[in-house]
Design a protein with these regions (language model features):
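Short helix/strand-capping turn motifs
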Residues: 92-95, 105-187, 191
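Hydrophobic alpha-helical segments and helix pairs
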Residues: 55-117
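N-terminal low-complexity or amphipathic/hydrophobic leaders
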Residues: 9-38
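Short, small-residue-biased leader/transition segments that mark boundaries at the very start
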Residues: 3-8
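Glycine-rich loop at the start of a catalytic domain that most often binds anionic cofactors/ligands
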Residues: 40-49
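Cys/His-clustered metal-coordination modules, chiefly Zn-binding fingers
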Residues: 161-257
């Protein structure tokens, strides 16, 4: 639905930018939003290479327009935003914050300030076609570096308050570079690198089989007793994986519990 597409693309865009901020190629960042609204929970996973994937709990949610616009906050509802950073340590870092507006950008800004103690401004927007498909999505994350002067901070805050919405900038055909130039105005801008983004799912039959094994011997035995192949679907890319009874027996033998 258009509501699910709008909310999901905002989260995908934010997640892609946050993933690009991770340091090592093997690092993985996940942004989860769990609200009590009709859209259900949403998950986005990204890495520093610009690869991103995600899924929506209820992609078919239909909501009436509010003042002629989609009401993102109503779709998401009240809930929690979680950011999970897997950087190869024994346990991943997990930061949880409440959803303050449920409009994604404000919630990510709040997360950065409260969980990472980094003053930030996040803007996100989605440009929809008349047939409710997404034409493009975009956004920005601006963070202060240590040593920023009060004068610079005041100037930046004033500028952010007066800029157009990201959706309006996309509608005007602005590129990411032009969006940054528009936001920063006469403040100095140096572009150090650009990273193309793309949807990428790393699921495979082997990875899915490990997930099946993780349910334990008792559950796998029930599947074997049914005497029929099982089909497992990937939430992220909707790929289908079929396991025969013989394959289930092999997975049963691999179970440790």
């Amino acid at each position: 639905s258009s509501a699910a597409s709008d909310v999901y693309k905002r989260q995908l865009t934010g997640g892609a930018m946050m993933g690009a901020m991770m340091k090592n190629d093997a690092d993985i960042l996940t942004v989860q939003i769990k609200g009590n609204g009709p859209i259900g929970s949403m998950t986005v996973t990204a890495n520093p290479k610009g690869e991103v994937k995600g899924f929506v709990g209820n992609p078919q949610v239909m909501l009436p327009l509010k003042d002629g616009k989609l009401d993102i906050a109503d779709a998401v509802g009240i809930g929690v935003l979680s950011v999970i950073k897997d950087i190869g340590l024994k346990e991943p870092y997990v930061g949880d914050t409440i959803l303050i507006t449920s409009e994604i950008a404000d919630d990510l800004t709040y997360y950065f300030a409260n969980s990472e103690q980094v003053p930030s401004s996040v803007g996100l927007g989605v440009l929809m076609n008349k047939d409710n498909t997404v034409e493009q999505a975009g956004g920005f994350i601006i963070q202060l570096m240590p040593g920023a002067t009060d004068e610079f901070i005041d100037k930046l805050e004033a500028r952010i308050k007066e800029i157009k919405s990201v959706t309006a900038m996309l509608e005007e055909g602005m590129t990411p570079e032009q969006i940054l130039e528009h936001i920063l105005g006469d403040m100095e801008l140096d572009i150090l690198d650009t990273i193309p983004t793309k949807f990428y799912c790393n699921c495979s039959k082997d990875r899915v089989s490990k997930a099946v094994i993780s349910v334990g011997k008792e559950e796998i035995q029930k599947m074997i007793d049914d005497g029929e192949p099982i089909e497992v679907n990937c939430h992220f890319c909707n790929s289908h994986y079929t396991f025969t009874v013989d394959e289930l027996k092999e997975m049963y033998d691999c179970c440790t519990r």
